[in-house]
C-alpha cells in the first residue's frame, strides 16, 4: 500500500500531535538536513538575504520540505557555486499524521470493523505553517541575488498553496537592517556571532565611564 497523498492532510483541522510517550512508532521525517551550503561563513560574508514566505495556513509534509531543499540547493550549486550561499530550512516537521488503514480485498467487511476505533496509526510527519511564516531562507553575496531568488522560485513548486519570495531588508540572517548594521560596525558596537551578530549595549551609568569609553569594547 502506497503513501497517502499529502493533499488529504493539507488543512489544519486539529490540535498539534507531536511525538511523545503516548504517540509511539512515528516514522522518521524525510528531511534530516536543515542547513546547506557554507553554514560556517561569518556574518560579514553574505549580506544579501531572501525568504520564501507561506501565504496560507496549512500542513507541509516532510517530503515536500526535503524536495524543496534539494531543488533550491541544486540550482544554487549549479549557478552560483557550492561555496557561495547558505540555505536554511526554517520550519520543522513535528506534527504526526495518522492513517486508519482500510482493507479493500474480498471479504474485508468480515475482517475489519469500519469506523469503530478509527483513531489511526502514525503514518508520517508534517510542519504546521501559518500565514506569513518563513519556509526557506538563503543568504549570499549581492552578486548572486538573482540566482537566490530563482532558486526559491523553483523550490516554490514543491509546496502546496501560495508562497511569496520576499527580499529581506536585513543584513543576512541578523535582525539588523543594512544601514543599522553598517553604522554599528563602524562604531565597533557589533560582535560577529556565527551567522548572527550581537549588539553591545551600555552597561552602567554613563557618568561612571571614562571619556571616549561610552561603549563596551568588542574584545
Swiss-Prot record:
<dbReference type="GO" id="GO:1990904">
    <property type="term" value="C:ribonucleoprotein complex"/>
</dbReference>
<comment type="subunit">
    <text>Component of the small ribosomal subunit. Mature ribosomes consist of a small (40S) and a large (60S) subunit. The 40S subunit contains about 33 different proteins and 1 molecule of RNA (18S). The 60S subunit contains about 49 different proteins and 3 molecules of RNA (25S, 5.8S and 5S).</text>
</comment>
<dbReference type="Pfam" id="PF00252">
    <property type="entry name" value="Ribosomal_L16"/>
</dbReference>
<keyword id="KW-0689">Ribosomal protein</keyword>
<dbReference type="GO" id="GO:0003735">
    <property type="term" value="F:structural constituent of ribosome"/>
</dbReference>
<dbReference type="GO" id="GO:0006412">
    <property type="term" value="P:translation"/>
</dbReference>
<dbReference type="InterPro" id="IPR047873">
    <property type="entry name" value="Ribosomal_uL16"/>
</dbReference>
<protein>
    <recommendedName>
        <fullName>Large ribosomal subunit protein uL16</fullName>
    </recommendedName>
</protein>
<comment type="similarity">
    <text>Belongs to the universal ribosomal protein uL16 family.</text>
</comment>
<dbReference type="InterPro" id="IPR018255">
    <property type="entry name" value="Ribosomal_uL16_CS_euk_arc"/>
</dbReference>
<dbReference type="InterPro" id="IPR016180">
    <property type="entry name" value="Ribosomal_uL16_dom"/>
</dbReference>
<dbReference type="InterPro" id="IPR001197">
    <property type="entry name" value="Ribosomal_uL16_euk_arch"/>
</dbReference>
<dbReference type="GO" id="GO:0005840">
    <property type="term" value="C:ribosome"/>
</dbReference>
<keyword id="KW-0687">Ribonucleoprotein</keyword>
<dbReference type="InterPro" id="IPR036920">
    <property type="entry name" value="Ribosomal_uL16_sf"/>
</dbReference>
